[in-house]
From Swiss-Prot:
The lineage of its organism: Bacteria, Bacillati, Bacillota, Clostridia, Eubacteriales. GO terms for cellular component: cytoplasm. Its EC number is 5.6.1.7. This is Chaperonin GroEL. Gene3D superfamilies: GroEL, GroEL-like equatorial domain, TCP-1-like chaperonin intermediate domain. It comes from the Bacteria.
Length: 542
């Protein structure tokens, strides 16, 4: 296919137009007075959201060259979301500012490669300062503050803090849609393990890239399954008794067996999601036994004379719900007998007391937490489905932000952490275009606060200057200058750091781009019937 090529300044300007198109759509959502964005859906009601990455994922531009710029910024938002789970709008705003300031200097004749070096040195120093500024987070109140700032809602903040208190900071917290209009917290017996679906064709929710199974059977074996004949007898029994979904936990699934299960899933005849068994060696056997006890099933292993092709329905476990992601499986509401679960917990506690190996003790404690800790389920309710989806996105973001805060600590929120570190970049001693790179980062660091102020209907530059001179932060909700940490307006250090690193990475790529290559738009083929309109007059030939 023929390609279109554009060079130098034309190429960089096309990328900038794409960057701006996406950033302008996303940045209106920043801060407590940020607005919403409405996204049309092919089917059903539109989505209303203020989540940066959700908006970014929906944007495709008609012009191929501009679209490249938009996709690069989309990568900033997505990467920040993957690493920190929040801060996607901040990352987008930073990327736009770095690109804008950088391209001004490149157009004026600066060397982009040397500017890039200056940007990298400045970001390295800024990240060091963010880490040094971070305060560890301990109390339930501090956790609630982080979640409140992220979700822009006190009640959600308190709910997440309560969930973390109940299942521990490393516990499993999931967010589900509720039938009612209230949002509440429920702690359910459940467990998670770090294995995801074997094939992406098994997912049921393409937006979240996960498989959700309600009231499924759970088939547990330590075998590698490659022949579908081994599975057929038990799967036929499942189909005859109401065709419930099935979670298959096995050593591996391959060849004909995998192909057949995927084909049946795509046809809608049988919904089987397969995951590899967690752990290794003897620990794997113990973990499979834990899952079996939790779900009321049996581990089908030839070591005790059980064969897969002879499996009965009563050997299968069940659970209220299972969610399988790319690298994690969460089992909620296992149907195992309480007495057996308690017996297993007591057995693991005894092993913890007796073991002399620190490594074994750590792994046993992990198993104990999975069996005893349970899963906290936040059930999201709202008056309409559109509102519920928007609320669920905010809770997901707040949960991710809170986990990030527990991991790396907190810094002053509302964009003030970025403004506070601008003066520390004076210590980065560089010359010429490299110094220009440092200055570009300094100007870009003002941008999140400027945008928060603009969204609150104030003059951003005035607010930035006041924050720089007073050393306080700006509370956009009350429009006051306050000590941000004391006021509970805080951001996770991990989110702040990731947003800056990812924005700088993509901005440096845009600045050092010299050529863009894209497919040439195809001309529409002429309609072969268009020239035959005059044939209608042949009726008179009779």
């Amino acid at each position: 296919m023929a390609k279109e090529i554009i060079f130098r300044e034309d190429a960089r300007r096309a990328l900038e137009r794409g960057v701006n198109a996406l950033a302008e759509a996303v940045k209106v959502t920043l801060g407590p007075k940020g607005r919403n964005v409405v996204i049309e859906k092919k089917f059903g009601a539109p989505t209303i959201t203020n989540d940066g990455v959700t908006i970014a994922r929906e944007i495709e531009l008609e012009d191929n060259f501009e679209n490249m710029g938009a996709q690069l910024v989309k990568e900033v938002a997505t990467k920040t979301n993957d690493v920190a789970g929040d801060g996607t709008t901040t990352a987008t705003v930073l990327a736009q500012a770095l690109v804008r300031e950088g391209l001004k200097n490149v157009a004026a004749g600066a060397n982009p490669m040397i500017i890039k070096r200056g940007i990298e040195k400045a970001v390295e120093k800024a990240v060091e300062e963010i880490k040094a500024m971070a305060k560890p987070i301990e109390s339930k109140e501090a956790i609630a503050q982080v979640a409140t700032v992220s979700a822009n809602d006190d009640s959600i903040g308190n709910l997440i803090a309560e969930a973390m208190e109940k299942v521990g900071k490393d516990g499993v917290i999931t967010v589900e849609e509720s039938q009612g209009i209230g949002t509440n917290l429920e702690v359910v017996e459940g467990m998670n393990f770090d294995r995801g679906y074997i094939s992406p064709y098994m997912i049921t929710d393409t937006d979240k890239m996960e498989a959700a199974l309600t009231d499924p059977y759970i088939l547990i074996t330590d075998k590698k399954v490659s022949s579908v004949q081994e599975l057929l007898p038990v799967l036929e029994k499942v189909v005859q008794t109401g065709n419930k979904p099935v979670l298959l936990i096995c050593e591996d699934l391959e060849g004909e067996a995998l192909a057949t299960l995927v084909l049946n899933k795509l046809r809608g005849t049988l919904n089987v999601v397969a995951v590899k068994a967690p752990g290794f060696g003897d620990r794997r056997k113990a973990m499979l036994e834990d899952i079996a006890i939790l779900t009321g099933g049996t581990v089908i292993t030839e070591e005790v004379g059980l064969k897969l092709d002879k499996a009965e329905l009563d050997m299968l476990g069940t659970a209220r719900q299972i969610r399988v992601k790319k690298e994690e499986t969460i089992i909620v509401g296992g149907a195992g007998e309480q007495a057996q679960i308690e017996g297993r917990i007591a057995q693991i506690k005894k092993q913890i007391e007796e073991t002399t190996s620190d490594f074994d003790r750590e792994k046993l404690q992990e198993r104990l937490a999975k069996l005893a800790g349970g899963v906290a389920v936040i059930q999201v309710g709202a008056a309409t489905e559109v509102e519920m989806k928007e609320k669920k996105l905010r809770i997901d973001d707040a949960l991710n932000a809170t986990r990030a805060a527990v991991e790396e600590g907190i810094v002053p929120g509302g964009g003030s952490a970025f403004v506070n570190i601008i003066t520390t970049l004076d210590s980065v001693q560089l010359e010429g275009d490299a110094k220009t790179g440092v200055d570009i980062v300094k100007r870009a660091l003002e941008e999140p606060l400027r945008q928060i102020a603009n969204n609150a209907g104030l003059e951003g530059s005035v607010v930035v200057e006041k924050v720089r001179t007073t050393g306080k932060g700006f509370n956009a909700m009350s429009e006051e200058y306050v000590d941000m940490i004391a006021a509970g307006i805080i951001d996770p250090a991990k989110v702040t750091r990731s947003a800056l690193q990812n924005a700088a990475s993509i901005a440096a790529m845009v600045l050092t781009t010299e050529t863009l290559v894209a497919d040439k738009p195809e001309k529409d083929a002429p309609n072969p019937m268009a020239g035959m309109g005059g044939m209608g007059g042949m009726g008179g030939m009779m």
